Amino acid sequence: ANLLILQVSYAQKSSELVIGGDECNINEHRFLAFTYSRGFFCGGTLINQEWVLTATHCDRIFMRIYLGLHNQSVRYDDQQIRYPKEKYFFPCSKNFTKWDKDIMLIRLDRPVKNSEHIAPLSLPSNPPSVGSVCRVMGWGTITAPNDTYPDVPHCANINLFNYTVCRGAYKGLPATSRTLCAGVLQGGIDTCVGDSGGPLICNGQFQGIVFWGGDPCAQPRKPALYTKVFDHLHWILSIIAGNTTATCPP
């Protein structure tokens, strides 16, 4: 499987790119962050002026976070670069397995300003519904198994399935999980290496974080797993509110 990380050939999508998509509209990803560290990159989501939500497996010692980026070869006047001031990792063990905790909150070294190309994406108010059409995006590879990385982010629509679909596709998954299963059953469209940490947006709400998938990406009947943002809301909001010792949901 593919963790979707640029440097890992395991089951995580730390660096997946969208396969089967098209270049994102320049105005549809104002919240999309690009995290970079010595050739390794991931996606992330700006959830307010001071916080970015991404995947734990995207963590690196030296990270530079770009906001307002579209074409990596062209710098917008309002592009902003930040560095992590604090990082928070989901600490819960009770009722959470290793599959449920690939989520990281990054506090930026200074707030970003809303602009033409930068604006946060709200956290979800409700969990997503199976059958929803969801949007994925990132600078991950657009081909598999051989990687091709674009200068611009690609976007695609995929479908949200019952978790049992992913459990049937991959051996070793737990019976239940706080992850979302999404993809296209006929294959050809998927997140992939380089897309890890980026958002899964269902019906306009930020519902998932790119986590794990098949290797190679975009194979038939091999949807990917996304960390379920809604199931981590208590922890996210507690940390942002200043309760840095927040542990598990009640």
From Swiss-Prot:
Residues 12-17 form a propeptide. Keywords: Disulfide bond, Glycoprotein, Hemostasis impairing toxin, Hydrolase, Protease, Secreted, Serine protease, Signal, Toxin, Zymogen. SMART domains: Tryp_SPc. Disulfide bonds join C24-C155, C42-C58, C134-C202, C166-C181, C192-C217. The active site is at H57 (charge relay system), D102 (charge relay system), S196 (charge relay system). Expressed by the venom gland. InterPro entries: Peptidase_S1_PA, Peptidase_S1_PA_chymotrypsin, Peptidase_S1A, Trypsin_dom, TRYPSIN_HIS, TRYPSIN_SER. It is found in: Secreted. GO terms for biological process: proteolysis. Monomer. Belongs to the peptidase S1 family. Snake venom subfamily. This is Snake venom serine protease pictobin.
